[in-house]
Amino acid sequence: AVMGDPAHASVFAFGLVAFGFLCMGPVTIAVDSYGPVTDNAQSVFELAQTEHIPGIKEEIKRDFGFDPDFERGKHFLESNDSAGNTFKATAKPVLIGTAVVGATTMIFSIILLLEKAGLLHLSLTDAPVLLGFICGGAVIYWFSGASMQAVTTGAYRAVEFIKKNMDLTKKEADIGDSITVVRICTEYAQAGMWNIFIALMTITLAFAFFDPNFFVAYLISIAVFGLFQAIFMANAGGSWDNAKKYVEVDLKQKGTPLHEATV
């Protein structure tokens, strides 16, 4: 009955927009994946230390017919990594928009159903509505902080393990220690995100039984605050990384206080 009502055609059209965004998902993911590929290429070159292999220049000249310039190659890889960061920052807002459009369609569908049942009266002068807006914004920033804390905790534990157990004077990495570091980071990140998921689902389900006006305002606030927070964090990460690349590649001031600040 709701979908057949012409008054609700705009909500259906919004759903079609969400469907169109989802259809662009493979293209967006392909563009977004360029960043990690370039980042890994630069990391592989740096960790391989090919330029320090005895006789490598003569071998490359003999096999491929050109004189290798490792410094120039490193510069190109760093520049490519910077371009990859820009690609990621450009593609992520599209994925964020997909989530927001889908969430908005769901929210307006809930609003229409509650209005049809006579349970909804949204007004900014009502205390439950104001409280819902405040709680939605608070949950977004709590989620952002808790997510970063989960990843940061794993990173600190990995650094502690490296300091205590790894011999940094070795020429080759120990595979067992490397696996342990990856396991530490993965376990802490997964444990942190699982706790966040349980808390978020519990809060949302509890709010759903509190008050219809409060719950709808809570959902609207999450969609609005979440949109701007997600775009801000997606662009901030790429900007910080590119600032570090600019100091390393263009200014050639790696190891200086300026470089330490950007790191």
How does the language model describe each region?
Residues 1-263:
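Hydrophobic packing and interface segments
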